[in-house]
From Swiss-Prot:
GO terms for biological process: adenylate cyclase-modulating G protein-coupled receptor signaling pathway; negative regulation of apoptotic process; positive regulation of insulin secretion involved in cellular response to glucose stimulus; protein kinase A signaling. Its main location: secreted. This is Glucagon. It holds the Pfam family Hormone_2. Glucagon plays a key role in glucose metabolism and homeostasis. Regulates blood glucose by increasing gluconeogenesis and decreasing glycolysis. The keyword Secreted applies. It comes from Callorhinchus milii.
Length: 29
């Protein structure tokens, strides 16, 4: 169960990182 919670938290973390990277990329172009 803790593994499932970890993976969902991790995917949320990856999504937020990807969103930040995307915004940075939009700003830089």
């Amino acid at each position: 169960h803790s593994e499932g919670t970890f993976s969902s938290d991790y995917s949320k973390y990856l999504d937020s990182r990807r969103a930040k990277d995307f915004v940075q990329w939009l700003m830089s172009t």
